[in-house]
Amino acid sequence: MRRTIFTSLMIIAFVGVCSVGCYNDVISPGSDPNGPPQFVSFSGDLIPLFNAHCNSSGCHDAGPAHAPSLVPEKAYNAIVSGGYINTAVPNSSTLYIVVQTGSMPPTGALPANNAQLILDWVRNGAPNN
């Protein structure tokens, strides 16, 4: 009799532990500390930025010596296929880092809002728009 009671209690305890262990944890994604990215047009916002600061006077123009080429007709493909962006972890994108840290352009750091434009464009998936 004692053995039957003990076995019954063990089965009940086992079922209880297993049913609690089957709880479905819902993991919600963390909120982005930067907030939602603003809309950035590659052709309307970034190409003018590149024209003003990057692809003039022998820097990131059509020549292969200073890749990537940032002339309007080649810029998107050069950036995307050259590995300069990372849409999974946008703030680790090379294009963003060199502008944000001030290492490019060599004539002086761009205003912070220009680095933010690049980051937001990458955060939006780096569309060719």
Language model features with spans:
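Sec-dependent bacterial lipoprotein signal peptides
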Residues: 1-22
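Aromatic- and Gly/Pro-enriched helix-to-coil junctions and flexible linker segments
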Residues: 21-129
